[in-house]
Amino acid sequence: MSWQAYVDEHLMCEIEGHHLTSAAIVGHDGAVWAQSTAFPQFKTEEMTNIMKDFDEPGFLAPTGLFLGPTKYMVIQGEPGAVIRGKKGSGGITVKKTGQAMVVGIYDEPMTPGQCNMVVERLGDYLLNRA
């Protein structure tokens, strides 16, 4: 299965009538492996900072998580494995795998729990395949 198929079929799938706003699989180096059409343009340093938070949990807490034009307030995740952010009625979940990050961005009516489930399920699957 191609990386794009993982994004299209596993991340952008419908859950209880809702789906993510956008999603991507991004290498640890910040290179995009696959993304949905609406995934925001981002700076390499934004991905570098996300990777740094995986290595040093809490690194993003004082400044927030920036991805493209959006700043997310970092909320409780799983240190070294999952970063979660909130912005208004939406948010972001980033799951680290062996070589990549699975990123999902959502807005209402999708819930944070639904976003977490979609992103973390694919991330866990990829981790178990390695």
Curated annotation (Swiss-Prot):
InterPro entries: PFN, PFN_euk, PFN_sf, Profilin_CS. A motif (Involved in PIP2 interaction) lies at residues 81-97. It is found in: Cytoplasm, Cytoskeleton. Keywords: Actin-binding, Allergen, Cytoplasm, Cytoskeleton, Disulfide bond, Phosphoprotein. Gene3D superfamilies: Dynein light chain 2a, cytoplasmic. Disulfide bonds join C13-C115. The modification Phosphothreonine is found at T111. SMART domains: PROF. It holds the Pfam family Profilin. Phosphorylated by MAP kinases. Transmembrane segments: none annotated. The keyword Zinc does not apply. GO terms for cellular component: cell cortex; cytoskeleton. Binds to actin and affects the structure of the cytoskeleton. At high concentrations, profilin prevents the polymerization of actin, whereas it enhances it at low concentrations. Occurs in many kinds of cells as a complex with monomeric actin in a 1:1 ratio. Belongs to the profilin family. PANTHER family: PROFILIN, PROFILIN-A. This is Profilin-12. It comes from Zea mays.
